[in-house]
A protein has these predicted regions:
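N-terminal cap/leader regions of alpha/beta-hydrolase-fold enzymes
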Residues: 1-231
Length: 231
């Protein structure tokens, strides 16, 4: 069942999309969006996770700036709109929002209390920051933009983390990827996978650079990881 819920955070209320599995109780996964908001792709990822047996929740990270953002990945004006939102986005406040969402979701009827965080691009960075600052049960990062700027916080990572990097990512340079990999080698609970020949958002269904084989590999690894960590 798919629906909307309201998250009461420390800084205010905001909405979230929720997809529930057929069988409850179940663990939960927060799905953190890219610069396009809680759009068709993000809702689709939630629906797929629900089919795999998870309660999937996608909070509206842009609620302070523009509640209800739902942009198209194929529209140039929407791209520019999303990039402007991203530039003005308060990442510190955003990490608090994610943690508040996790706290609320852990107590939802039908949730066993375990909550992982999974994010794409901006959402990937917010997954990293939330895990480092507040702790989560598990974390999955898909091509988290600007992660290299926050590697000084890596010591705060204690939860199991899975990270997916596209080797030809036009938004995360090879040098930045090398920095990320080096920093995470000190964390035995972190696993980084690189995908040769892949560009940014290769796992996004409607993305320009979508690659079905690479997406299936990454998503299969994610599914296995989540089932292992949230049992």
């Amino acid at each position: 069942m798919n629906d909307r819920i309201t998250i009461e955070g420390r800084d205010g209320e905001f909405s979230a999309y929720i997809a529930r599995p057929k069988v409850l109780p179940a663990p939960a996964v927060l799905v953190l969006h890219e610069v396009f908001g809680v759009n068709t792709d993000i809702r689709g990822h939630c629906d797929e996770l629900a089919e795999q047996g998870f309660i999937a929740v996608a909070p509206d990270l842009f609620w302070r700036q523009e509640p209800g953002v739902d942009l198209s990945v194929t529209s140039e004006p929407d791209w520019q709109h999303g990039l402007r939102l991203n530039q003005a986005y308060d990442r510190d406040a955003g990490a608090r929002d994610v943690k508040d969402t996790a706290n609320v979701v852990a107590k939802l009827p039908g949730c066993i209390g375990k909550v992982a965080v999974l994010g794409y691009c901006l959402g990937g960075l917010m997954t990293f920051l939330t895990a480092a600052r507040y702790g989560v049960d598990a974390a999955v990062v898909y091509h988290g933009g600007d992660t290299e700027k926050y590697l000084g916080e890596v010591d705060g990572l204690h939860a199991p983390m899975l990270m997916h990097l596209a080797e030809e990512d036009e938004f995360i340079s090879k040098a930045a990827q090398a920095e990320i990999k080096k920093a995470l080698t000190s964390k035995p609970n972190a696993t980084v996978y690189s995908y040769p020949g892949q560009r940014h958002a290769f796992s996004r269904h409607n993305g320009t650079h979508y690659n079905a084989a690479a997406a299936a590999l990454a998503n299969g690894r994610t599914s296995e990881f989540l089932h292992q960590q949230l049992r």
